[in-house]
């Protein structure tokens, strides 16, 4: 299956990385000052718990056809990874430790 992302992602991609976790692992627990991210689970599944300041929502990413956009103000936790889960993250900025809150 071929997935084309350039019309889905609403920003210029500056950084790409993968998160590969074992079951029971939790990642995130922060938000960013200026980075927007696109999350795609390219293998397996995981849940993204997101709080935008007004409401909390859980998103199941279980297909490479699903892309979740996280804005800088979104507090997020990535969890409930199944054993083969690989999460692709596309970011609007280069890595900067000072961008994390």
Please state what every model-predicted region is.
Residues 61-81:
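Conserved metal-binding segment of the jelly-roll/cupin
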